[in-house]
């Protein structure tokens, strides 16, 4: 996953200036789906999925939802979106934002595009959503 530009600036301000992350107090994260890259300078609303029934999934920022080992964070639980009830999208990217915000913390292309149409439920199994710092 790549960091969004605003998040990169936030992290540099934290490291170099001691400025707290604006979203440091957020206890939850939102997972978004996209039909194309939202881009490093983009917001989570850029190219966001539009199929009927789509809604972001909110997960906790906690050790019960994520395992951090070395330079990687991995989801510990199933992340499951609502079943598509109409329309269709080809999902190519996912992003993570602070809950209720459009600021992209990180985003990435999926391993392969996923066609979502009526009856399809997008999900990330435990251990399949990985954020790596390098």
Please give the residue ranges for each predicted region.
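Small cysteine-rich, disulfide-bonded extracellular modules of the LU/uPAR three-finger superfamily
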Residues: 1-94, 98-134
């Amino acid at each position: 996953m790549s960091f969004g530009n605003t998040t990169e600036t936030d992290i540099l301000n934290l490291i170099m200036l001691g400025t707290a992350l604006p979203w440091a107090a957020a206890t939850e994260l939102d997972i978004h789906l996209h039909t194309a890259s939202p881009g490093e300078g983009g917001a989570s609303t850029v190219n966001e999925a539009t199929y009927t029934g789509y809604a972001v999934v909110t997960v906790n920022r906690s050790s019960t939802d994520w395992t951090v080992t070395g330079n990687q964070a991995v989801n510990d639980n199933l992340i499951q979106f609502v079943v598509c009830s109409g329309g269709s999208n080809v999902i190519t990217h996912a992003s993570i934002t602070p809950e209720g915000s459009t600021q992209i913390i990180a985003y990435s292309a999926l391993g392969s595009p996923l066609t979502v149409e009526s009856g399809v439920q997008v999900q990330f199994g435990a251990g399949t959503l990985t954020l790596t710092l390098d």
